[in-house]
């Protein structure tokens, strides 16, 4: 099968009517962000949410857009867009005539509805206390809502929103989690409630369906509607949940439960025998099958995600992709229930694959690009896709043909010449084939300084995707040749390659980075091998601290964002203990300190010498900001040129527009200081 490249699709859709220029910080900050697509059952309409940046208010604003798929050449139109109001999470009614959505109009989150042809939106719910999201039953007579309420809450009633205030401002805890990602635990849990849906709305506070299960559904911090699914008849809800308790910070054991939508019976655990993660329950449109993914190993968050299938009549379970060495990242059934569309990383790309539910046969449907959402249709699918040189747009897959539906940022990107991306491979650690890419600034002549970017995870990838936080095209626009390596531990190359980083954080990955940079500077003569800065966040930030003590003479400067500085302190400061303990062999620090100390950057501070910019967020509970302050203290104490950026708003990620803009200015300014490249 021959694929039309994303670059070709982009070239077809976007003209360049004005003088060419490079991508800038302001461009990236102000781009429109399209996502959360929904398609009517008849394939007539596409609706999505689109974020615009309000830089003065330092936030994004979400509106709803629509596109008539039945008309060739139709243009996108705003469906709902009120000033200072966010409209998001669109869903169609079964007949395709109504769009349900979430809105914060009036200051309180509520579910609203609007005719797809337009008109005045109608508010459907009136409960107080906020909620996380919703799903309308296929039968159209119920709405499933998830919201943070006190454990055992019988309904969404405001009295169940928070516990009574303590005598003082202090918080008290008797077990972990005390905080998670960026939030201190307040005693509530994300729980599921069902409300009736009538022509007049969705009255009342609903009924709880979890019957005393204590845990978060969807899971925190990243879970959403993909972790809950209605049965086709609207009588059953399937959901993923990790039962809370003292082992919660040590456990990846989410299970799949089935619950009565009327709350009349206790939920049934459908996966009690698997102690790894089970997630993404997805019922087939014909109501006969339940698909989900399963990980085999307990405590390992990056294990292979195998597509599973349960016959809902007999209870028979089959592993559909047990022999496919890739991880299923998303699941969506075709309307006729004869195909399952999945996404899975594969060598720096994230394509769509089709899985036959009868045989388990896997067929790749798209080529290059990063697929971020898939909505099956009768003839194929509508999907969202981005790349290193293009933010998200929507495309139509019909059979094996891909056609572009939108050019959301055509005007904002007009006149900008994107860089050239070249993928390459080399022999890395263990004599394995390792992949990377190099990004060349458009129109560059002569040699350019290097931005050597190391990804996080560590089970992650520097793939062909757009990013707003670490944007390779923006670094190229600033005049840098960006090099990224998918070292051992990266995803998209089979499970053994990902597993190779366990108990090996500073070993094979560093060998790969050294070999990869050498391969890049040998292959691409436009890279200035003697003028390079290294930068990375999370595991990439750890690697920056490790490089300081192990490879310090190689770089003019280093940018370290939210990286581990002291593995011992990290073992007691982080919240998701399962991750830290798995990565160091499966034991807590006090049982096996040698495993943590072997690759501990703090042990090599005496060898540090490279100028470093340290960045951290005060709301980062994954790698707490004290790790960044400690690294900066070490640099200052040794007299090494260094700078510290502490963001009081940031968690492990920098999300606010002004903070993001500041981040880029600081990073490019620091790199420019040491490479001689003038910053924007």
Describe each model-derived feature in a short phrase:
Residues 38, 144-146, 169-174, 178-197, ...:
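Non-catalytic accessory segments flanking enzyme active sites
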Residues 41-42, 94-95, 138-139, 232-233, ...:
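Residue-level detector of Asp-centered blade-edge/turn motifs that repeat once per structural unit
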Residues 43-46, 96-99, 143-144, 237, ...:
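Hydrophobic beta-strand positions that form the internal "hydrophobic ladder"
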Residues 50-63, 80-87, 100-112, 126-132, ...:
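A flexible loop/linker signature enriched in serine peptidases of the S9 family
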Residues 69-72, 115-119, 197-201, 260-264, ...:
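Short loop/turn segments that connect beta-strands within beta-propeller blades
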Residues 298, 408-530, 537, 570-572, ...:
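Cap/lid segment of the alpha/beta-hydrolase catalytic domain
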Residues 484-680:
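Active-site-proximal cap/loop segments of hydrolase catalytic domains
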């Amino acid at each position: 099968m021959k694929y039309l490249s994303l670059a070709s699709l982009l070239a077809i859709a976007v003209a360049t009517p004005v003088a060419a220029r490079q991508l800038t910080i302001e461009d990236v900050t102000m781009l429109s962000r399209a996502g959360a697509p929904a398609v009517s059952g008849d394939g007539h309409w596409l609706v999505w949410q689109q974020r615009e940046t309000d830089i003065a208010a330092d936030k994004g604003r979400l509106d709803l857009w629509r596109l008539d798929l039945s008309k060739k050449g139709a243009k996108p139109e705003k469906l709902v867009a009120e000033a200072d109001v966010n409209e998001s999470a669109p869903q169609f009614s079964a007949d395709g005539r109504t769009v349900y959505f979430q809105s914060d109009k009036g200051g309180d989150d509520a579910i609203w509805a609007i005719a797809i042809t337009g008109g005045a939106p109608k508010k459907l719910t009136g409960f107080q206390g906020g909620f996380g999201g919703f799903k309308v039953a296929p039968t159209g007579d119920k709405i499933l809502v998830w919201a943070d309420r006190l454990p055992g809450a019988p309904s969404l009633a405001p009295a169940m929103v928070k516990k009574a205030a303590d005598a003082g401002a202090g918080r008290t805890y008797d077990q972990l989690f005390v905080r998670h990602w960026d939030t201190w635990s307040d005693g509530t849990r994300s729980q599921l409630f069902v409300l009736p849906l009538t022509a007049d709305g969705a009255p009342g506070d609903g009924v709880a369906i979890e019957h005393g299960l204590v845990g978060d559904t969807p899971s925190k911090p990243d879970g959403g509607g993909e972790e809950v699914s209605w049965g086709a008849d609207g009588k059953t809800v399937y959901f993923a949940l990790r039962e809370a308790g003292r082992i919660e910070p040590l456990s990846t054991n989410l299970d799949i439960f089935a619950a009565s939508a009327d709350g009349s019976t206790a939920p049934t655990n459908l996966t009690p025998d698997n102690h790894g993660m089970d997630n993404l329950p997805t019922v087939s449109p014909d109501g006969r099958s339940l698909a989900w993914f399963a990980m085999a190993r307990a405590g390992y968050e990056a294990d292979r995600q195998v597509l599973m299938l349960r016959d809902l009549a007999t209870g028979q379970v089959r592993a559909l992709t047990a022999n496919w060495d890739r991880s299923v990242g998303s699941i969506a059934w075709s309307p006729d229930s004869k195909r399952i569309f999945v996404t899975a990383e594969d060598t720096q790309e994230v394509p769509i694959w089709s899985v036959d539910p009868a045989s388990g046969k896997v067929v790749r449907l798209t080529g290059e690009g990063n697929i971020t959402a898939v909505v099956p249709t009768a003839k194929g699918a509508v999907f969202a896709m981005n790349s290193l040189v293009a933010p998200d747009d929507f495309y139509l897959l019909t059979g094996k043909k891909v056609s572009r539906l939108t050019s959301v940022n055509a005007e904002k990107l007009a006149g900008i010449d994107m860089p050239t991306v070249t993928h390459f491979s080399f022999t890395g650690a263990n004599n394995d084939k390792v992949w990377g890419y190099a990004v060349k600034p458009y129109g560059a002549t002569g040699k350019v300084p290097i931005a050597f970017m190391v990804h996080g995870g560590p089970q992650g990838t520097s793939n062909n995707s757009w990013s707003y936080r670490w944007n390779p095209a923006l670094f190229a626009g600033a005049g840098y040749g960006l090099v990224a390596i998918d070292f051992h531990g990266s995803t998209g190359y089979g499970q053994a390659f990902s597993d190779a980083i366990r108990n090996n954080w500073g070993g094979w990955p560093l060998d790969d980075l050294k070999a990869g940079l050498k391969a890049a500077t040998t292959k691409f003569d436009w890279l200035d091998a003697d003028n390079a800065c290294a930068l990375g966040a999370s595991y990439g930030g750890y690697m920056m601290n490790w490089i300081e003590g192990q490879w310090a003479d190689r770089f003019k400067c280093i940018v370290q964002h939210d990286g581990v500085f002291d593995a011992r302190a990290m073992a007691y400061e982080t919240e998701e203990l399962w991750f830290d303990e798995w990565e160091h062999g499966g034991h807590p620090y006090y049982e096996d300190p040698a495993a943590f100390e072997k690759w501990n950057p703090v042990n090599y501070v005496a060898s540090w010498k490279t100028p470093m910019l340290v960045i951290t967020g005060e709301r980062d509970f994954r790698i707490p900001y004290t790790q960044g302050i400690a690294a900066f203290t070490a640099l200052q104490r040794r007299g090494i040129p260094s700078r510290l950026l502490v963001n009081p708003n940031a968690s492990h990620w920098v999300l606010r527009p002004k903070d993001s803009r500041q981040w880029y200015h600081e990073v490019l300014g620091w790199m420019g200081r040491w490479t001689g490249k003038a910053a924007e």
